[in-house]
Structure formats: C-alpha cells, structure tokens
Amino acid sequence: MRILITLPWGERLGGAEAMLHGVLEGASHEHVELVFLQPGPWADELAAAGFRVEVVRAGRLRQLHRWLATVLRLAQIIRRRRPDVILNWSAKTQLYGAPAAALAGMSGRNIWWQHSIATGAWIDRLATLLPTRAIGCTSLAAARAQEQLRPRRRTFVVSAGSPPPETSAGAASLPAGTGRPVVGLVGRLQPWKGQQRMLEAQGLLRGQGHNFHLLIVGGDSYGLSPEYPAQLSTTIEQLGLENAVTMVGEVPDPGPYIQTMDVLVNASDPEPFGIVLLEGMARGIAVMAVNSGGPPEFIEHGRTGVLARSGEPSELAKALKPLLVSPQLRAKLARAGRDRYLRDFTDTAMRERFFAALEALCVQ
C-alpha cells in the first residue's frame, strides 16, 4: 500500500503532528510520501529520516491564484506517484488535496483526517463538502461531531498512541523551594485549552488551604492566540499566584517537565483526544481531564485517572482536590494508568491500528 500524505504545517507543535509523527516513525520510507504545504523543520527532519518529501508553498487560502497553482501542482504529483491512498492531514489540506485528486482521476482514493472536534466552522463544512472516501478521527467523540455535518460522510476512528519515554531523560528543574505537589498542563496557549480556568481553579483551592505549584508548558504555537499569554500573566498577578506558577513557554520536548509533575491535567472542554495524557500515563503520572471529548474513551474515572464533570474552575478544583491530599490515590491511579497505556496506547499499537484501517479502506 502506497500512501501520499499532504500536510499543512512545516513544524511539529501540536497533537495532530505528534500523532502523525508517531505513525511515521515506524512506517516504510518506500511506501509513504509526504507533501508539505509550507517549509519548516519538520519537513526537513522527515526528509533527513529517508522519506520522500516535497514542499509546495501554498500561501494563504484566500489567495485564489496560489490555491489554484497548489491544486494543479498536487494533481501532477498524484498522477506521477499514483498512490493507493491520498491522506490529507487536516481540513485545510483537504481543500487542496480533494480537488487535486479529482483532477488526477483518483477521488476514490482520497481520505482526510479530522483531528479536532468539528464545530461547524466554515473550513470543516467546506472540507466535508468535497469528495472523500472516508474521514479519519482520533476519537469516537470527534467522529460523532463530524457525522453531524452534511453531506454525511463515512468516518473511521484510530485512537492515538505515544512512544515509551526515554529512560535517559531526566526531570526538568523547578524553582527552588517549591515543596508542594506539582500540577502541570502541557499544550499550546489558547483559551480552549483551559489554562485560564486552571489558574482560577488554583485560586479557589488556595482559598481552601490546598497549595500546589502549577507548571504551564507551552507557547503561542502558530500565533493563533497572541494576546492569551499576557492575559494569563495578568490573571496570575490578580490572584496573587506569582510564586505558585511557572510558565516555561514552548519547549521541543515536554517529557522532562512532565516527569516533575505529581498530576498532569488536561483542562480542555472538550479535548479531541489528549495525547499528552498518554505521555503522563506512560511515565507513571496521575492524570486528570474533563469528562468530554476523547479523554473518557481511555481514562476510567477513579481507576486510571480522574475526570472533572466540566471545565469550569469550580469543577476542576473539585476533581483535583482528592489528588492533592492523597499521595496514595495518585500512586494508585498512576500505576493503573500506566498499565492501560502499555496495553492499548503505545506508538506500536497506534501504528498497527492506523495502517490496518487504511488497508481495510483500500480493499473495500
């Protein structure tokens, strides 16, 4: 099976990129080719690893002449390569890949990946309107949301996975004198990711006498919310949390920071999947998320982690409180979470699921 994947980003900063990178790390260089719509270090990294990589500078979608030129170039590549599967790794690349596949006479081989939970935004509606054999999703929640769009397209689900942590990687250093449980969030700084709500939850818990150090790992990836980091800093000052919060910004590898945490929180509501939670589970860290989106599909409340009833600060605080007061509970959840990860959510298991799903689509 020969696969041609179109990608919108030249950098590897978010969950969608992390999932695909994990898939590619075990893929055959001879059977997978990549077309990036912008240059960047990720494209260079994969080319250096031995993959056939082409970069087609697409520009912005609103630049119609650039869109047309990109579609025509992609159609040429598809005709030349004649892949068994054309996989557009986002709604954005579907807007280029689907017309290109049609021009090449291969619409029946076109698939796209919906990593987010569709909200009816114009780009999701337009991507769904274009021809596709199926739409891949990372969770049942994402698939159900996608199926609400029209025309209703066939969906399939491949749960993400995460590679085992490197044993040589040590923990990062935190400010001296922390001496309290460390609770962390890892992800780009955007309002829907919930850093603001988590700060407010920290303020509530502090008022109840439960102190912890909050570690926020991530930056303003892709410049999607440029004013948000300053907003978080203002909230920290207003709540008097200057000595109880560390913001480390964008880092190439969050693993050493995750290793310092007593609890890893995902405060998104909803979260499409939550690969970072798997990274915590793999390291034997207790995890907490919101009971919406993808996390409930692999976190069993009270057994392999904790699920807050919503992303509201009061509910986040209520869910986190038992973890703060009981090291024994944290250890119990961490052990069960790691067992769950090892059983079903390693990168090897993810690759097997992923390629089996594509093979099944090819033979139908």
Where are these regions (language model features)?
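Conserved donor-binding/catalytic core segment of Leloir-type glycosyltransferases
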Residues: 4, 176-193, 199-202, 215
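A conserved nucleotide-sugar
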Residues: 29-31, 195, 199-246, 325-328
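Short hydrophobic beta-strand element within catalytic cores of glycosyltransferases
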Residues: 35, 286-289, 299
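Short His-centered aromatic/hydrophobic patch
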Residues: 88-94, 114
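A conserved, positively charged/aromatic
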Residues: 108-140, 149-151
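Aromatic "clamp/platform" in nucleotide-sugar-dependent glycosyltransferases that forms part
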Residues: 250, 269
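Conserved acidic donor-binding segment of nucleotide-sugar-dependent glycosyltransferases
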Residues: 291, 301-302, 306-313, 322-327
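A short, well-ordered alpha-helix in the C-terminal region of glycosyltransferases
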Residues: 315, 322, 329-344, 350-353
